[in-house]
Amino acid sequence: MDVTVQPSEYNTLKPLLLNCERQAFLRDWGDSAFDPVGYVEAKWQTYTPGTAAGRGNYACYSSPKVDELIKAGASEPDPDRRQEIYFEMQRLIHEDAPAVFLYVPQEIEAASARVHGWEPSPDSRINLHDVWLSE
């Protein structure tokens, strides 16, 4: 294997990724909503320029069946049926192997004793709306 590492700023790299002009890249993507729809729409739905569909689909993955399941899961009100839809989607994505899932990043977060109201968030976001500083 012959590899050339090319560090890039994200704004330079993103159009290259969306146009399938890179063979590989490394990045994490946390779940910001505790719901599969936001993640799967961004990462695995077929990229459609000018829409939110596939806005983070840097694997250039396209599957009509997965696209169909994404739409079905997003509009399904029954939690059990919704889970079945997402499990089927997960199975298809796993079989197609559009990406190599390497790791889950570990985070260490700390704050000064002057910081109050802050707690780590399981969705990887830094929520500051309840934070305040003491003297």
State each model region's role.
Residues 1, 98-100, 129:
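Structural beta-strand/beta-sheet cores of well-ordered domains, especially the beta-sheet scaffolds
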Residues 1-49:
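Periplasmic binding protein-like
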Residues 1-7, 68, 72, 81:
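A local structural motif
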Residues 10, 25, 34, 39, ...:
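Aromatic side chains
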Residues 16-21, 41-71, 75, 104-135:
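Short, solvent-exposed loop/beta-turn-alpha elements that line the ligand-binding surface or hinge
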Residues 25-29, 76-113:
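Bilobed periplasmic-binding protein-like "clamshell/Venus-flytrap" ligand-binding domains
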